[in-house]
Amino acid sequence: MAARETKRELRKQARRNAIVRTSRIWTKLYKELTSELKDISHKWLKSLLRQAEHEISSGTLTTVKELPERFTRRLTQTLRHSLAQGYLLNHVYVHELKKAREGKKYHGRITLSDEDDEARLIASLEKFISSEEAEEWHEVIPEEAVNWLKDYVPKLAGVLSEDVTSKVNSVIRESMMTGTTLQERMKALRESSEVIQRMTDARIEAIARTEITRADTMGRLISMKSNEDVIGVEFSAIMDDRTTEICSSRHGLFMRLDDPRLPENTPPLHCRCRSLLIPCTVYDFPDGLLTSHEFDEVPASKQRDYDIEEVRKILEDMPT
C-alpha cells in the first residue's frame, strides 16, 4: 500500500511540476519577447513618422515599409525556444511518469523536480537552441517541427506587418487631410502617433502570448505523437479571473490522441490563450483512455482554420 501511495504521489508531483515549470518559462519568454519586439517596433514607428512628416510637408504620400528583418528574426528565435521547450519538457515529463511507476525519481540532464534550479533549467534549454547548435537542433527535434516553424513565422510576421502598416497608412492619410495649414496637419500626425504606439504595443502583446503558447503546444504534440507510451491528452487551463469559458469548460477533460477532434481542441484556442495539453500515458491509464463525453458540449474555439489544419497535418504526418 505504501509503495502504491508513493508512486501515486510521484505522478501527481510530476504533473504539478510540468504545469508550474511551463507557466514560469512561458512568462519569462513572454516578457522578454514583448519587451524586445516593442523596442524594435518603437524605433520602426519613429522612422515611419519622420517619413510621414516629410511627406505631409512635401504633399506626397508613399506606402510605409514593412517591419524590419530583425523583428522576424527575434520572433523566430523565441518561438524556436518555445517549440523546443514544449518538445523537451513533454519528453522529460513522460520519463518522470515512467520512473514514478517504479516508485523512483527521474534523474536526467533536465528534470522538472521541485529542487531543480529554475535558472539552470532555462539555461539548459537556451543552450540546447543556442546559435552554435541551431543548425543541428533538428537532429533532436524532429524535422517536421523545424519545417512547421520555418513556414509559419514568416506568415505570422507578414500578418502583423500588414496589420500595423495599414493602420499607420490610414492615420497618415487622415493627418494629411486634417486642417487647412501644414502646421495643423503636422500637429494631427503627432497626436496620432501615441494612438499608433498603443495600438502596436497591444497587438505585440497579444501575438507574443498567443504564439508562444502555439509553438510550445506544437512541440508537445510532436513529442507525444512520436512516443508510443502517450495515448491521449488532458486539457489544463490556468484557472483565474482571466480564464475564458472556452478554456474553463475544457479544464480537466481527457481526449485520445487519435480523436479527430483534437486539432479543434489544441491550444491556443483564442487570443492570449494560456492553456496546455498534458500527455496521458499508459502508466496513468493501463486499461486505456476514453475521450471525455463533455467535449460534445464545450463552446467552439476561436482558432483560425489555417491553424487547425496545421495541427491536423502534424498529427497525420508523424509516425504512430
Features from the language model and the residues they span:
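N-terminal leader/targeting and assembly helices and adjacent pre-domain segments
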Residues: 1-198, 281-320
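Acidic, glycine-rich two-metal-ion catalytic cores of nucleic acid-processing enzymes
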Residues: 195-295
